[in-house]
């Protein structure tokens, strides 16, 4: 079904009150520190996450600069170890995970018609303890022994008090625990909000795909983050109280790997699934079509969540202590529901009236990049290939294609998509496209070539290599493109600041024109409790039906949903005007 008809709902543009500027000095900072509004906390999460992302990117540039030529340039081996440890930690636990809760905080209550999250104070606690945990980890750089240097996977015995005796390592472990507590708090909040605060008519199978994905991610987070916290406390117990939980002499090294990866691989899907949801919200809007295979997408998400708990040991093939056929088969199997998602995304775009606004470009960039990462993941699921490629730069390339391709591309798509809803202003399309192409070219130039150098045998986590190894030209190409990737954040930062202050004002509920979920049925930005009134929810596309009531009968007929008895239900009447007045 293609929707191209003009609006006929008598829409009234909302009045946007401008700030007077008469508040006391410092009052904004105090309100920010004490707020429990899910929208403000969502924006704070996103800003905090991108701040850590920029810092982690600087660490990555130092790593790539060191590897530009053979020999140690300006970093010692110890400093190199600290940088790749903190780079991985910052990107995964201080950027990738918090930005999930940032988008969830802002968008999810709006999508289900809730006035706020279920536990506003717990929400604020989760944000601040995550921030404090991140600062604690990074403060390790200021300690005498430097920051943690045992890798973000914290393998034993590298993480014991003998091999990593510094205070920075202890602060890293405490910081990991704090960020884990913040994620558990957010997961409890999102899960309870979804189950208890949905608007009338918002059944589970009328929820947006993004909300469904956050639901599954919250369940996963409640299963895995307490395990990470307990395992990390065990490391602290060994370091400070002389325990032997992870002593290699009694198999403790393998125990740690099992505990860590039982957390670590589901965590990959905690990072990925929300961004699958973001892309699933964007593609229908700019394809002018409903999501193809809505129910199939939901069951694919549920399947990925379930299977993600059964594949952790594919990270341990080279230990020789896991059942190779089982974990290899499960890893191959989890690619099936992921393939279903790609099929649905492509099916949504098929014969649609596609327009290439910035959010859509980022979404297609996500699809291309993540698809390549998924294909190399299938290669690594084969034990014979994994034996050859383990701990090489092939693994680094696969990991970045999978996570950078998912988290960065889709989070940028989400920012460009929901920025008008958050701020009431449009972002600059030209700067957004410059940002995309610099990122796309810089990323693929940096990491595509690492597949080849990894296959040639270059190991990861080495600060140096020999000229005779033949790795030099590959590393130089990768480093040059990495600096292009680093430069790509400049138009993004400028776009955000420029648009926040001077961007085109949004005077309608749905600036994209074809939004489906409920956040597009209230003003930009929404009022304190989100809605003055809610439209009737009769499908998974309530905002579209609100703005295009003349198409409801056609949508029901083409969707074959069996809800034809709703066609003759009372019309929406003045609901559009009420929704538009929600900024008063």
UniProtKB/Swiss-Prot annotation:
What's a Pfam family this protein contains?
COX1
Q: In which pathway does it act?
A: Energy metabolism; oxidative phosphorylation
In Gene Ontology terms, what is one molecular function of this protein? Answer: metal ion binding
Q: Does this UniProt record's set of keywords contain Membrane?
A: yes
Does this entry carry the keyword Cell membrane?
yes
Assigned protein family:
Belongs to the heme-copper respiratory oxidase family.
The protein here is known as Cytochrome c oxidase subunit 1
């Amino acid at each position: 079904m293609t929707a191209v008809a003009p609006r006929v709902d008598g829409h009234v543009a909302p009045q946007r009150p401008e700030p007077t500027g008469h508040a006391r000095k410092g009052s904004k900072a105090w309100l920010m520190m004490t707020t429990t509004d899910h929208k403000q906390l969502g924006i704070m999460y996103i800003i905090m996450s991108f701040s850590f992302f920029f810092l982690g990117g600087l660490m990555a540039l130092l790593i790539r600069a060191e590897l530009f030529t053979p020999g140690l340039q300006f970093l010692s081996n110890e400093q190199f170890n600290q940088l790749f440890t903190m780079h991985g930690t910052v990107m995964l636990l201080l950027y990738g995970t918090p930005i999930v809760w940032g988008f969830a905080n802002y968008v999810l209550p709006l999508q289900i018609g809730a006035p706020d999250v279920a536990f506003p104070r717990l929400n604020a606690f989760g944000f601040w303890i995550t921030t404090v945990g991140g600062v604690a980890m990074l403060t390790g750089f200021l300690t005498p022994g430097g920051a943690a240097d045992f890798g973000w996977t914290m393998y034993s015995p590298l993480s014991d008090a003998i091999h990593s005796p510094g205070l920075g390592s202890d602060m890293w472990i405490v910081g990991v625990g704090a960020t884990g507590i913040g994620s558990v708090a957010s997961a409890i909040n999102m899960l309870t909000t979804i189950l208890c605060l949905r608007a009338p008519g918002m059944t589970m199978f009328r929820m947006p795909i993004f909300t469904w994905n956050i639901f599954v991610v919250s369940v996963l987070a409640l299963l895995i983050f307490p395990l990470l916290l307990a395992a990390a406390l065990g490391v602290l117990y060994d370091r400070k109280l002389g325990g032997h939980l992870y002593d290699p002499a009694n198999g403790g090294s393998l125990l740690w790997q099992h505990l860590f990866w039982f957390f670590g691989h589901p965590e990959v899907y905690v990072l990925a699934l929300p961004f699958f949801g973001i892309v699933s919200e964007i593609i229908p809007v700019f394809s002018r079509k409903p999501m193809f295979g809505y129910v199939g997408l939901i069951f694919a998400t549920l399947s990925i969540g379930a299977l993600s708990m059964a594949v952790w040991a594919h990270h341990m093939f080279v230990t020789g202590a896991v059942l190779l056929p089982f974990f290899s088969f499960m890893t191959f199997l989890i690619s099936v529901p992921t393939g279903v998602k790609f099929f649905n995304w492509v099916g949504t775009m098929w014969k649609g009236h596609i327009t290439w606004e910035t959010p859509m470009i980022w979404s297609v960039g996500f699809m291309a990049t993540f698809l390549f990462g998924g294909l190399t993941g299938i290669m690594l699921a084969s034990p014979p290939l994994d034996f050859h490629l383990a701990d090489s730069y092939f693994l680094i390339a696969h990991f970045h294609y999978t996570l950078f391709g998912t988290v960065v591309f889709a989070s940028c798509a989400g920012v460009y998509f929901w920025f008008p809803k958050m701020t009431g202003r449009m972002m600059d399309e030209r700067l957004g496209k410059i940002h995309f192409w610099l990122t796309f070219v810089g990323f693929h130039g940096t990491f595509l070539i690492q597949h080849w150098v990894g296959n040639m045998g270059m190991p990861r986590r080495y600060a140096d290599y020999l000229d005779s190894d033949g790795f030099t030209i590959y590393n130089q190409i990768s480093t040059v493109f990495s600096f292009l990737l680093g430069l790509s954040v400049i138009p993004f930062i400028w776009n955000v600041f420029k648009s926040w202050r001077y961007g085109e004002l949004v005077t309608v509920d749905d600036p994209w024109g074809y939004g489906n979920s409920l956040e597009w049925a209230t003003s930009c930005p929404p009022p304190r409790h989100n809605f003055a009134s809610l439209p009737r929810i009769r499908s998974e596309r309530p905002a579209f039906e609100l703005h295009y009531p003349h198409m409801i009968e056609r949508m029901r007929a083409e969707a074959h949903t069996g809800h034809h008895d709703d066609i003759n239900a009372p019309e929406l009447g003045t609901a559009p005007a009420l929704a538009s007045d929600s900024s008063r």
